[in-house]
């Protein structure tokens, strides 16, 4: 019952609150007298953001919401009045566009020209073109901006893009500038940009080029939403149980945050300092555990603090949660986070939500970025001086410009030609110089590009083909110096050693057919239509010619080399429903079934026909036995049966076998029963013979039913039964079998069990006589002195071998007599044609003819393809003509198309002449010179080089003749070849237009596999092992680099601190990222490539392990990796312009790195290979050190978010995520308990979640009052009342009736009240505080179980408060 003092206390409180409210109101009135700050400037998106943030910080939520509302109204009002909309006329194309494009065109024409003259390579041309267009595009954007700013600053499009309301510059550029370069489906950039914009409209070609990218964008967006949603789900699952559960974990560990360019930006805001922070002069700026707000962050910057230690979720030591001090501010209200805040879920959502904004990937940029290096120009005319410190080496830029690269830092001076101060330029290592020492230069000349620090970019090797543009003869410049390179497989390739030109000198190149031989001599003159080369096709064996109809562009000539007609046999064909059947009939009437049909081809040892013979056909299946003397040839496969070696007698014991696959319930007879023919043994299956049945079954499924015919005799004679046990024995006629049992014929005796008793079954034996050789008429064969032979032989084949059991109901054929083809030539392509021919005497009778044909395909004259010259083919034979072996069947001539001089390369043994060249009059040019020529014979000249004083050449080629006032040149085309390129052609080779000349090998910046956006985030958070990861240094030391022979591989040796030597072999195609003599640390990259995070953690741990205790080494290694992961994830988001606070990523990374793997359990109860929390192992090992046991050894592990989710302590959470069955079965087998600590488990079970208002931080006070469980409320009409627990975790809520007397809600009931309630329920006083189930206490000790009073339970059940259970 409440008493009066508590009433008075309440009224005093109310008065106090009213006073405070009045004071606050007065203060706000006073504040409003100071004039609001007045700002006069353009407000764009950025300023709006700052304005709303300022309002939120200083005036709270309600005021900000109201202000935002007013801003919106203001915006709409003026947008309406100003009529901001987009019309076609707002899209204004800058006038400067035409000039910019013309300049670009001019540059590109120059580039193409230098490529044509062989000054730059194909790769350099491509790079230059792409860079030119990229630069033009950038200059055009500037022109667009300038145009809008100067001429129409209030243009709707410009205002939208500029203020950040909608759209960005790249979109405006496409509307009014140019669309620019597009990528093709392979991701390479097409070097033809789209010059028009959307205002001018695209041509069909441009539209098609851009449609690829547009479709890709749409598909990416669709995929992205799904991917991003799944990422969020995994993140939520891994972090859902991270809840702020304590105020301060008291850890002394922390992370360091460094200033970037002297500024911290937002990176410190909302964190707590881990140590005192001192300024440069030693004054204390902040104590430990100070909250850092923006003003304090600015003070740090002002005081010159470059790095400081802050508390972070990564180092928090709170058990299975994060404490308030380590987490810092909740970013929703910029105050220290509350207890019970579900920070894990907030972190997951913060990282997952921007996923949709991340691109899936962008494409290759192809061009080489020129942004990192600053271009320096000369300010006046003067002379260049390098100075004594300079060290330079020749270098060719990616655009093909010959420059010099500096190897050291030095100063370059330009001394003016007149008076004045010299210009000094600081040159850094790696910079490019475009001038020479002592060179005189004009003003505004590019002197150098300064490299921005020693940046080692990762590059990859790429290749590009050089394709020949004209037919002719290849000639190298001597500078190329080709060398032979043999690779590991023994293939020989030719490589260029130096930069140089490869020339192709013009001419008409003819390809010769494989067997053609030239009929003109090298250097001889040829006239039009003269035969240059001739090829002939000859017969190999000779024979009768058959000309076939022409097919397409070729004609088949068949030569019958051998033929054989079976004269003793008639060929008879009959039609059946299954198709045509052909038989051979001999004079004595025996018939053979033909296995092939006329018109088909057969090979050696194939069966032509088979004797139709029923003498060896049985009635049923049975057992085969060979009598002594019968022999067969061993065969590899029994498919065609076994050939008889020697004739003899074959014994056959018939038995009928039914192979069945049916249920045993369908069986209609019993095992061992005697049945008559026609008995139904299984439903719908009848026996053909009488005999004894045996049944084979397996798992109540019938397999076989065997019926053995014969005569059955009951027998009790033990000796006889033993003799005939098992497989049975063959007994000759008249031989005694048992007492009173004998047989006149040969029988096969077996002992059998029947329902009547044991007895002997005498089975009949059939005898078949097998002749030694097949009795056949003469078949004959044809032999030729030099052609292939042909013959037919008869063979007998037995279908089964000795003791083989034939399972069958129908009869089988035991012996087959077959006619086989025998060609004594065993070449696989030798086939025989089977033909039906009429008999020479009786035309109605058909005979079988076997023919061996030689087939020659003769090309008909087609409208000749130009490379073959004009070909002319003639047949030299007629149909039916007989020719001898080696006679020519057809000849092909290659005719000259235009008069000229024929040349051909030298024929070698391994390579005959396959091409020849005719140098035509138009391939040379004679130029008259005004003065004496300055060139010599054999010299190669390109456009613009002087032939005579003041007379430049207007074509490229090789000088062939020089006279007093003229020069004759053979036209040609130079191709620049870069060093290390693969040469496909040799000096002097002849090439056709479109042939590959060389493969240029060049290095380009790696762009293809920068996995951007989502896939990269996923790769990091799932801790994926990359396919080709970089090689990491295991221990710190000094690097030594050794080159392997032939540049095949490099070895990087690291001499470690204890003088141990670690060797890292590096394969071809990998770029070494360290230099000789460099100091490296553990985990540093030795080669380029993606890093394997697992390997990195291992490197850190192994290195620290040798110097520090196990626990410290693990913590430090994990800390290094955590820092790396957070930075990497942040980099991806920053590159896409998304800002996420570090602490969210830290919460996730903390979950990924919280586990260690036990290697050796020591004396602990842990198991080797178990994944367990680091803190748990730490506690276990501390306990071991007290008791003196051996501690557990472990290694830290990194788990991807999916793995971490499946490895949580809660099996309910893991099962609801993935692999439900596996997780639940394992949990059941291991007998796991789930302590329901996280949110997900509780949601699934349907309890209050332990976050926010359900957070159990106030548990202790409740426990003190009411024991360990939430309370059950009585249904007392006076209101809600506490009652001691009946069952844990169940709350019975009953609505209260309007209060009759003013009892304070949830105050403790008085003794009298309790007594009344008890008496109403009939509960005895002692029984009221029983606990039906007790929950394990906080320290996991079970409270003792108390016994229920049966009477009380019964009473409660009657009232329906306890169920029967």
Swiss-Prot record:
One Pfam family named in its UniProt record: RNA_pol_Rpb1_5
Binding site for Zn(2+): 249, 316, 323, 326
Catalytic activity of the protein: RNA(n) + a ribonucleoside 5'-triphosphate = RNA(n+1) + diphosphate
Cofactor(s) for this UniProt protein: Zn(2+)
GO-annotated molecular function: DNA binding; DNA-directed RNA polymerase activity; zinc ion binding
Top EC class for this record: transferase
Name of the molecule in the record: DNA-directed RNA polymerase subunit beta'
Keyword Zinc carried by entry: yes
CDD domains per the UniProt record, alphabetical: RNAP_beta'_C
Keyword tags: DNA-directed RNA polymerase, Metal-binding, Nucleotidyltransferase, Transcription, Transferase, Zinc
Assembly and oligomerization: In cyanobacteria the RNAP catalytic core is composed of 2 alpha, 1 beta, 1 beta', 1 gamma and 1 omega subunit. When a sigma factor is associated with the core the holoenzyme is formed, which can initiate transcription.
Comment on bound cofactor: Binds 1 Zn(2+) ion per subunit.
This protein's record includes keyword Zinc: yes
InterPro entries listed in its UniProt record: DNA-dir_RpoC2_beta_pp, DNA-dir_RpoC_beta_prime, RNA_pol_Rpb1_3, RNA_pol_Rpb1_3_sf, RNA_pol_Rpb1_4, RNA_pol_Rpb1_5, Rpb1_funnel_sf
């Amino acid at each position: 019952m409440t008493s009066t003092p508590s009433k008075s206390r309440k009224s005093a409180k109310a008065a106090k609150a009213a006073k405070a409210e009045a004071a606050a109101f007065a203060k706000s009135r006073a504040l409003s007298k100071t004039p609001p700050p007045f700002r006069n400037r353009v407000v764009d998106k950025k300023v709006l953001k700052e304005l709303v943030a300022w309002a939120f910080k200083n005036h709270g939520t309600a005021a900000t919401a109201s202000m935002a509302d007013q801003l919106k109204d203001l915006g709409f009002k003026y947008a309406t009045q100003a009529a901001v909309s987009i019309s076609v006329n707002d899209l204004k194309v800058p006038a400067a566009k035409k000039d910019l494009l013309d300049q670009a065109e001019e540059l590109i024409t120059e580039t193409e020209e230098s490529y044509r003259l062989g000054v730059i390579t194909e790769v350099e041309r491509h790079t230059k073109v792409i860079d030119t267009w990229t630069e033009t595009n950038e200059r055009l954007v500037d022109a667009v901006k300038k145009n809008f700013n100067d001429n129409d600053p209030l243009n709707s499009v410009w205002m939208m893009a500029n203020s950040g309301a909608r759209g960005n510059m790249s979109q405006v550029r496409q509307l009014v500038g140019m669309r620019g370069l597009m990528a093709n489906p392979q991701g390479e950039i097409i070097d033809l940009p789209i010059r028009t914009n959307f205002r001018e409209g695209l041509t069909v070609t441009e539209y098609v080029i851009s449609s690829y990218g547009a479709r890709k964008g749409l598909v990416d967006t669709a995929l992205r939403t799904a991917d991003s949603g799944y990422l969020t789900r995994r993140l939520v699952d891994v972090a859902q149980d991270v809840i702020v559960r304590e105020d301060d974990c008291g850890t002394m560990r922390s992370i360091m945050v460094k200033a970037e360019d002297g500024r911290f930006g937002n990176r410190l805001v909302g964190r707590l300092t881990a140590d005192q922070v001192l300024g440069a002069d030693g004054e204390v700026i902040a104590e430990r555990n100070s909250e850092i707000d923006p003003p304090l962050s600015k003070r740090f910057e002002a005081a010159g603090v470059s790095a400081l230690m802050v508390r972070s979720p990564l180092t928090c030591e709170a058990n299975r949660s994060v404490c308030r001090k380590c987490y810092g501010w909740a970013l929703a209200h910029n105050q220290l986070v509350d207890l019970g805040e579900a920070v894990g879920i907030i972190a997951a959502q913060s990282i997952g939500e921007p996923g949709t904004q991340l691109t899936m990937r962008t494409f290759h940029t192809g061009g080489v970025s020129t942004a990192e290096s600053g271009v320096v120009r000369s300010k006046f005319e003067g002379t260049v001086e390098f100075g004594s410190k300079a060290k330079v080496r020749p270098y060719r830029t990616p655009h093909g410009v010959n420059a010099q690269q500096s190897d050291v830092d030095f100063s370059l001076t330009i001394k003016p030609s007149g008076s004045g101060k010299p210009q000094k330029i600081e040159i850094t290592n790696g910079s490019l110089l475009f001038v020479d020492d002592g060179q005189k230069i004009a003003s505004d000349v590019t002197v150098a590009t300064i490299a921005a620090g020693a940046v080692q970019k990762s590059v990859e090797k790429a290749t590009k083909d050089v394709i020949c543009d004209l037919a002719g003869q290849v000639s190298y410049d001597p500078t190329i110096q080709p060398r032979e390179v043999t690779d590991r497989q023994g293939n020989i390739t030719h490589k260029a050693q130096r930069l140089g030109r490869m020339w192709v000198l013009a001419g008409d190149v003819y390809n010769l057919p494989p067997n053609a031989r030239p009929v003109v001599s090298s250097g001889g003159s040829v006239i039009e239509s003269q035969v240059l080369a001739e090829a002939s096709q000859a017969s190999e064996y000779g024979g009768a010619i058959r000309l076939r109809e022409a097919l397409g562009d070729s004609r088949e000539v068949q030569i019958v080399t051998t033929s054989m007609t079976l004269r003793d046999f008639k060929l008879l064909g009959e039609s059946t429903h299954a198709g045509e059947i052909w038989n051979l009939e001999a004079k004595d009437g025996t018939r053979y079934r033909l296995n092939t049909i006329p018109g088909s081809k057969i090979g050696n040892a194939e069966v032509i026909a088979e004797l139709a013979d029923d003498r060896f056909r049985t009635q049923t299946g049975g057992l085969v036995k060979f009598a002594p003397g019968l022999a067969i040839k061993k065969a590899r496969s029994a498919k065609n049966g076994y050939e008889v070696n020697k004739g003899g007698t074959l014994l056959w014991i018939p038995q009928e076998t039914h192979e069945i696959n049916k249920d045993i319930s369908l069986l209609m007879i019993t095992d061992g029963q005697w049945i008559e023919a026609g008995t139904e043994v299984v439903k719908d299956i009848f026996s053909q013979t009488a005999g004894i049945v045996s049944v084979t079954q397996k798992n109540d499924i019938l397999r076989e039913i065997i019926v053995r015919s014969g005569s059955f005799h009951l027998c009790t004679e033990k000796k006889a039964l033993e003799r005939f046990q098992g497989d049975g024995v063959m007994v000759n006629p008249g031989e005694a079998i048992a007492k009173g049992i004998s047989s006149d014929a040969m029988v096969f005796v077996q002992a059998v069990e029947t329902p009547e008793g044991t007895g002997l079954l005498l089975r009949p034996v059939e005898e078949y006589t097998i002749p030694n050789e097949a009795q056949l008429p003469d078949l004959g064969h044809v032999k030729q002195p030099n052609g292939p032979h042909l013959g037919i032989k008869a063979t007998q084949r037995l279908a089964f071998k000795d003791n083989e059991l034939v399972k069958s109901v129908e009869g089988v054929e035991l012996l087959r007599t077959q006619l086989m083809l025998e060609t004594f030539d065993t070449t696989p392509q030798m086939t025989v044609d089977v033909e039906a021919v009429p008999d020479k005497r009786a035309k109605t009778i058909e005979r079988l003819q076997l023919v061996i044909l030689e087939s020659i395909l003769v090309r008909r004259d087609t409208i000749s393809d130009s490379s073959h010259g004009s070909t002319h083919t003639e047949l030299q034979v007629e149909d039916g003509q007989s020719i001898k072996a080696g006679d020519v069947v057809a000849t092909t001539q290659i005719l000259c198309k235009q008069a000229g001089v024929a040349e051909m390369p030298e024929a070698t043994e391994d390579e005959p002449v396959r091409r020849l060249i005719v140098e035509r009059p138009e391939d040379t040019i004679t130029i008259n010179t005004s003065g004496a020529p300055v060139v010599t014979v054999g010299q190669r000249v390109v456009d613009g080089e002087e032939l005579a004083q003041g007379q430049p050449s207007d074509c490229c080629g090789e000088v062939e003749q020089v006279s007093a006032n003229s020069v004759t040149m053979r036209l040609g085309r130079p191709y620049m070849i870069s060093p290390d390129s693969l040469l496909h052609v040799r000096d002097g080779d002849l090439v056709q237009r479109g042939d590959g000349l060389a493969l240029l090998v060049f290095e380009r910046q790696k762009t293809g596999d920068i996995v951007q956006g989502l896939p990269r985030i996923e790769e990091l958070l799932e801790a994926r092992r990359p396919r080709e990861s970089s090689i990491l240094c295991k221990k710190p030391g000094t690097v030594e680099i050794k080159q392997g022979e032939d540049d095949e591989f490099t070895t990087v040796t690291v001499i470690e601190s204890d003088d141990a030597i670690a060797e890292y072999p590096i394969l071809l195609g990998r770029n070494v990222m360290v230099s000789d003599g460099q100091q490296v640390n553990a985990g540093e990259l030795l080669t380029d490539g993606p890093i394997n995070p697992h390997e990195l953690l291992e490197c850190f741990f192994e290195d620290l392990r040798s110097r520090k205790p196990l626990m410290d080494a693990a913590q430090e290694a994990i800390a290094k990796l955590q820092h790396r992961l957070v930075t990497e994830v942040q980099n991806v988001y920053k590159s896409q312009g998304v800002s996420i606070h570090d602490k969210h990523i830290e919460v996730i990374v903390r979950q990924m790195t919280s586990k260690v793997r036990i290697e050796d359990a020591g004396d602990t109860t842990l198991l080797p290979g178990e994944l367990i929390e680091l803190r748990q192992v730490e506690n276990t090992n501390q306990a071991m050190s007290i008791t003196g046991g051996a501690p557990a050894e472990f290694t830290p592990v990194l788990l991807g978010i999916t793995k971490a989710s499946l490895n949580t302590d809660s099996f309910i959470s893991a099962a609801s995520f993935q692999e439900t069955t596996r997780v639940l079965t394992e949990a059941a087998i291991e007998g796991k308990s789930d302590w329901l600590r996280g949110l997900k488990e509780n949601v699934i079970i349907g309890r209050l979640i332990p976050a926010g208002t359900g957070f159990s931080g106030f548990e202790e006070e409740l426990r003190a009052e009411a024991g360990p469980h939430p309370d059950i409320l009585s249904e007392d009409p006076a209101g809600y009342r506490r009652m001691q627990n009946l069952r844990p975790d169940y709350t019975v809520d009953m609505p209260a009736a309007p209060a009759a007397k003013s009892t304070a809600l949830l105050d403790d009931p008085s003794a009298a009240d309790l007594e009344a309630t008890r008496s109403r329920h009939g509960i005895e006083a002692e029984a009221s505080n029983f606990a039906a189930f007790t929950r394990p206490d906080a320290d996991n000790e079970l409270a003792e179980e108390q016994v229920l009073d049966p009477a009380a339970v019964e009473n409660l059940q009657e009232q329906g408060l306890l169920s029967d259970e």
